């Protein structure tokens, strides 16, 4: 099975409250834990280990395990590598991916910095120590860059925009409206971005037009076509990459029927660049009861920044096949087209997390934690521009949407995790964690709405029907050949929470993310210690559709994207 992610280029709408998808909620809610080099080196299997500042975000009780105060700082270098291939259309019912291309992007980050302060109560039993801490840990890295493309002689992005524009009046899309006296009034180029179509006879009268449709019309990539006496003439469209042929037949409404096709092949290219990260700032308190039982609590403040930039280009292989007749202005030929979409999201939220760690006997540790849902406020900004070029540059056109902005609230899901760890004579450590996250509990709300806010009713229903539980399993090991040196290794995998419907049943997509890590640690006889870790994260395959299917019996292009993240992390710390 596979999932297809449609790009924002085809879903940019005027109604901002309808532009969010369940994948936005998933992107902003998912955790790909970073932390210290020690925790990364052990696969973040730290629920029952503790003592490390990277473990505090996984189990708050971990801060109480260390019988000392400490400070750590952790720089990180992450390399994203993406292998992308392109299929113009189905061949024999399946995609034929080719033209594989690799792109990489490197980013520096600081996935951990913080300190804990240990206070001895002086009691020989009961509560023997309290630890206070402030720690910032990275919980996701959005870095990624990709490019893909190929030859297509069947479908076109501009053609898909022509289909999306059907039903909207050309005058409205260019900034005109009808006043109370039924007169045509110029409202300005940006009018259709904020107001519904009000032309009297439009099929879409009262509807908001998609922003990408408006920009394509205003750039001159789309136009009305055919017999101007047809009743539907002013709200049917053809793209600059298309030609039409009159059949001589009419439909039931009296409009002539036309055959529309591409007159030649196009060279198409899609590219995407994503940067950003998510962090949790933790106010922590941990309680040590006789070195046997530990409790902890976090007040977590989540912050995220997500920057998404994508483009789509198509150019005529033989422009002379793409003749364009502009009437009295003359004729020219389509050359090339480019559209670009830029999107930024910033968010913050608050949650609570509570955990315990228990040593029933020497050498065995058991731990668990529960995290409340995070209530986040997300602030979005976006813009799209369109450029269309012809062999005669005097016909070239361009358009840019206004900068859109919108804010809403997202309730991310709760998390439960449990773990066990085994130590062997102070020389070796084995640990294993299980974490579950129920993404069906995600919920979108308007910024000022309450829990029963119905603004996102349909989207929240879709989340409940198509999202479920994601399972994460983490295992780690540490071996000390000498007291000062530690060798580490770890592995974890995370399953997708997404379901697909098959008849009356739902089946989980068979996708998962795998991560492999190794690490080394040095601990001096004094206060200084240092760790280094390397991790490879292999994300699940991604299938991208750069524009919607618009022909009944022919699919639009599909891109297969294979994504890997390589990271090198170093931690420098001092105990006091």
Model-derived regions, located:
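Bacterial Sec-dependent N-terminal signal peptides
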Residues: 1-24, 572
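Active-site-proximal flexible loops/turns
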Residues: 9, 66, 305-307
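Hydrophobic alpha-helical membrane-insertion segments
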Residues: 11-12, 68, 435, 442
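Outer-membrane beta-barrel porins/channels
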Residues: 20-34, 39, 118-576
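Outer-membrane beta-barrel translocator/receptor signature
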Residues: 37, 49-58, 64-146, 150-153, ...
């Amino acid at each position: 099975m596979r999932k297809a992610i449609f790009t924002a280029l085809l879903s940019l709408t005027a109604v901002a409250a309808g532009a969010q998808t369940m994948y936005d909620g998933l992107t902003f809610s998912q955790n790909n834990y970073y932390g210290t080099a020690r925790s990364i080196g052990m696969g973040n299997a730290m629920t029952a280990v503790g003592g490390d500042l990277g473990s505090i975000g996984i189990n708050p009780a971990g801060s109480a395990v260390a019988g000392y105060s400490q400070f750590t700082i952790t720089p990180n270098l992450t390399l994203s590598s993406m292998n992308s291939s392109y299929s113009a259309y189905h061949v024999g019912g399946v995609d034929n991916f080719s033209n594989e291309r690799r792109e990489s992007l490197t980013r520096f980050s600081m996935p951990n910095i913080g300190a804990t302060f240990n206070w001895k109560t002086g009691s020989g039993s009961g509560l023997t120590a309290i630890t206070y801490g402030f720690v910032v840990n990275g919980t996701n890295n959005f870095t990624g860059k990709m490019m893909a493309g190929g030859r297509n002689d069947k479908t076109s992005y501009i053609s898909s925009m022509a289909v999306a524009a059907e039903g909207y009046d050309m005058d409205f899309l260019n900034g005109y409206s009808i006043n109370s006296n039924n007169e045509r009034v110029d409202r300005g180029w940006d009018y259709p971005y904020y107001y519904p179509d009000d032309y009297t006879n439009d099929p879409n009268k009262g509807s908001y037009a998609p922003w990408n449709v408006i920009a394509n019309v205003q750039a001159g990539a789309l136009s009305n076509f055919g017999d101007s006496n047809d009743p539907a003439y002013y709200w049917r469209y053809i793209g600059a990459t298309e030609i039409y042929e009159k059949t001589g037949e009419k439909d039931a409404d009296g409009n002539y029927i036309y055959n529309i096709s591409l007159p030649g092949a196009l060279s198409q290219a899609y590219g995407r660049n994503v940067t950003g990260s998510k962090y949790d700032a933790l106010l922590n308190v941990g309680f040590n009861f006789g070195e046997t039982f530990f409790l902890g609590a976090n007040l977590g403040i989540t912050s995220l920044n997500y920057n998404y930039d994508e483009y789509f280009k198509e150019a005529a292989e033989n422009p002379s096949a793409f003749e364009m007749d502009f009437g009295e202005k003359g004729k020219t030929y389509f050359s090339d087209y480019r559209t670009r979409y830029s999107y930024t999201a910033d968010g913050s939220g608050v949650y609570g997390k509570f955990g315990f760690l228990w040593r029933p006997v020497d050498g065995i540790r058991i731990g668990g934690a529960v995290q409340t849902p995070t209530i986040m406020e997300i602030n979005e900004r976006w813009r799209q521009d369109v450029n269309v070029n012809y062999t005669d540059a005097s016909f070239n056109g361009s358009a840019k949407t206004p900068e859109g902005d919108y804010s809403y609230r997202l309730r991310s899901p709760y998390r439960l995790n449990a773990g066990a760890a085994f130590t062997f004579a102070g020389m070796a450590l084995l640990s294993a964690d299980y974490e579950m996250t129920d993404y069906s509990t995600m919920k979108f709300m308007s910024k000022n709405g309450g829990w029963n806010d119905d603004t996102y009713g349909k989207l929240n229903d879709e989340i409940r029907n198509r999202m479920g539980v994601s399972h994460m399993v983490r295992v780690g090991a540490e071996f000390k050949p000498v007291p000062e040196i530690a060798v580490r290794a770890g592995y974890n995998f995370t399953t997708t929470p997404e379901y697909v419907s098959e008849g009356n049943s739902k089946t989980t997509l068979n996708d998962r993310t795998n991560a492999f890590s190794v690490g080394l640690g040095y601990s001096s006889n004094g206060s200084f210690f240092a760790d280094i870790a390397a991790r490879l994260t292999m994300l699940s395959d991604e299938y991208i559709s750069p524009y919607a299917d618009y022909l009944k019996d022919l699919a639009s292009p599909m891109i297969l994207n294979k994504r890997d993240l390589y990271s090198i992390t170093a931690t420098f710390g001092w105990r006091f």
